[in-house]
């Protein structure tokens, strides 16, 4: 089981899931900054 979690596909899925979670949480607290990064 340990070998499964150390595999590259699992690491990639975990990285994408973590990044998506950070973006979602950031967008929840600061909804305008994601769509207007330069203050336009």
Curated annotation (Swiss-Prot):
The chain crosses the membrane at residues 4-24. It is a single-pass membrane protein. InterPro entries: PSI_PsaJ (IPR002615), PSI_PsaJ_sf (IPR036062). It is found in: Cellular thylakoid membrane. GO terms for biological process: photosynthesis. SUPFAM superfamilies: Subunit IX of photosystem I reaction centre, PsaJ (SSF81544). GO terms for cellular component: photosystem I; plasma membrane-derived thylakoid membrane. Keywords: Membrane, Photosynthesis, Photosystem I, Thylakoid, Transmembrane, Transmembrane helix. Signal peptide: none annotated. May help in the organization of the PsaE and PsaF subunits. Belongs to the PsaJ family. This is Photosystem I reaction center subunit IX. It comes from Prochlorococcus marinus (strain MIT 9313).
């Amino acid at each position: 089981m340990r070998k499964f979690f150390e595999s590259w596909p699992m690491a990639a899925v975990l990285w994408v899931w973590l990044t998506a979670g950070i973006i979602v949480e950031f967008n929840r607290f600061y909804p305008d900054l994601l769509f207007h990064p330069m203050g336009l």
